[in-house]
């Protein structure tokens, strides 16, 4: 089964064939670290971490690079407002970013380059563009000359005449064409700066990714990814800079994830529906947030609401409960061989369907459907009078494997059998002492942990709900 990726550049699904056999070079645009990330910022790390995980599962060696923009207009503004320097603010929010995305199940990139640590190669990149005639200096600023790059607009599929008609030259800009964009910005008084051939200043946003992608992944990369909002102008400008310099294809597959809406409204500060990750993960299990995000195909918009989140949680808990019941039943099962083939064959079908979904442009929504199918099938199997250790181990292994591919964990902070038995004994003692309030409290606490008690003439029985 081959993997197919929807390529924004061609607007169609294409068979994925990396430049080098069994190796994938992948660049994902990272955050500008001037504040905590919101849930819209968190979607790309989760989506493309899942893409990476699946590629690794399929046997690819993935070089995954995701940058930090640690000098920028927003950082300078934040520094001025807080009375701190730019590096201090950047360091704080780099650390906060790692805390947030790690909680959401994202692995660290192979490399997390920072702009300020790569200033030399950025300046060299700009100088080469100037030497080739693709860029020009204007009163300390350096701009990219878009009319010199014939392919400008090919990613966003917009005619250059339309782009030029909608563009304008802002006050203070000294560019020759409204479509030209800054590669280097002359420093204003009091701003952080670096020395360059054009005077003191700092790089423009777009050139940073081009330079760092080239440094760590080479002239041509396999997959370049990011949010839908980056396709134009950021990724369009990256293509122009990189291909003008090297004369080679910059990225072979372009992937973009969709937006997030809050209660059917576009997320924005003005509407007051701005949700920060470090706030939401205090309210909800980060694993639930990830499961929710992956329950929709990455190219589609997501509507984020508490009702939908709760509904998703119910589904996730059903899968985890089935997994817990399988683990609980493991010890009481035997090494039966009769009728194993049917159940194991069905498991193989679910595995195939999961991979078919992921091979189809990483359709995690359909892949998650197969997780539900495995859980439902497992529950049916557990109704059998006699169960086989071989089959139960196969269910457990499959659920663990599929969850791991999606960056999810099945491990529940659940009570051990011995702990449950001890609480039941404590409840029995409470009933003997006519302490019915304590007895009911223990029963309710166990119910909250998905442990169902049944009082019978033979004593108290329990099961995982």
UniProtKB/Swiss-Prot annotation:
Keywords: Aminoacyl-tRNA synthetase, ATP-binding, Cytoplasm, Ligase, Metal-binding, Nucleotide-binding, Phosphoprotein, Protein biosynthesis, Zinc
Subcellular location: Cytoplasm
Swiss-Prot/TrEMBL cofactor(s): Zn(2+)
Pfam short name (any one): tRNA-synt_1e
Motif ('KMSKS' region): 266-270
Any one GO BP annotation for this protein: cysteinyl-tRNA aminoacylation
Keyword Metal-binding among UniProt keywords: yes
This protein's GO CC annotations: cytosol
Protein's recorded name: Cysteine--tRNA ligase
Organism of this sequence: Bacillus anthracis
């Amino acid at each position: 089964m081959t993997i197919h990726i929807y390529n924004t550049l061609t607007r169609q699904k294409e068979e994925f064939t990396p430049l080098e056999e069994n190796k994938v070079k992948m660049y994902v645009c990272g955050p500008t670290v001037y504040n905590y990330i919101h849930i819209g910022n968190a979607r790309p790390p989760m989506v493309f971490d899942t893409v990476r995980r699946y590629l690794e599962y399929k046997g690819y060696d993935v070089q995954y690079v995701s940058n930090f923009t640690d000098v920028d207009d927003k950082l300078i503004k934040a520094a001025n407002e807080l009375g701190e320097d730019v590096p201090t603010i950047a360091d704080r929010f780099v650390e906060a970013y790692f805390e947030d995305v790690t909680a959401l199940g994202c692995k660290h990139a192979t490399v997390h380059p920072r702009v300020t640590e790569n200033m030399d190669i950025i300046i060299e990149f700009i100088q080469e563009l100037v030497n080739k005639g693709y860029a020009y200096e204007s009163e300390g600023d350096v701009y990219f000359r878009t009319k010199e790059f014939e392919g400008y607009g090919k990613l966003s599929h917009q005619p250059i005449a339309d782009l030029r008609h909608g563009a304008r030259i802002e006050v203070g800009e000294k560019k020759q064409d409204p479509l030209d964009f800054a590669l280097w910005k002359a420093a204003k008084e009091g701003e952080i700066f670096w020395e360059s051939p054009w005077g003191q200043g700092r790089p423009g946003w777009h050139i940073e990714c081009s330079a760092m992608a080239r440094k760590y992944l080479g002239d041509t990369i396999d997959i370049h990814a990011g949010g839908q909002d980056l396709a134009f102008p950021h990724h369009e400008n990256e293509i122009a800079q990189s291909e003008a310099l090297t004369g080679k294809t910059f990225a072979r597959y372009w992937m973009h994830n969709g937006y997030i809406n809050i209660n059917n409204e576009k997320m924005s500060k003005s509407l007051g529906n701005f949700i920060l990750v470090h706030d939401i993960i205090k309210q909800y299990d980060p694993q639930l947030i990830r499961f929710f995000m992956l329950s929709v195909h990455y190219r589609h918009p997501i509507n984020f609401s508490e009702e939908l989140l709760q509904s998703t949680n119910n589904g996730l808990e059903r899968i985890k409960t089935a997994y817990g019941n399988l683990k609980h039943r493991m010890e009481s099962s035997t090494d039966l061989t009769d009728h194993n083939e049917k159940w194991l064959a069905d498991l193989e079908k679910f595995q195939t369907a999961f991979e078919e979904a992921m091979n189809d442009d990483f359709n995690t929504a359909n892949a998650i459907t197969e997780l539900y199918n495995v859980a439902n099938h497992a529950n049916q199997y557990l109704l059998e009078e006699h169960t086989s250790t071989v089959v139960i181990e196969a269910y457990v292994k499959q659920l663990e494997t599929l969850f791991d591919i999606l960056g999810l964990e099945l491990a529940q902070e659940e009570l051990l059998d011995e702990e449950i038995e001890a609480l039941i004994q404590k409840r029995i003692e409470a009933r003997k002492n006519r302490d019915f309030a304590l007895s009911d409290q223990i029963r309710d606490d166990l119910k909250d942990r998905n442990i169902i008690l049944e009082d019978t003439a033979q004593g108290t029985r329990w099961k995982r709900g």
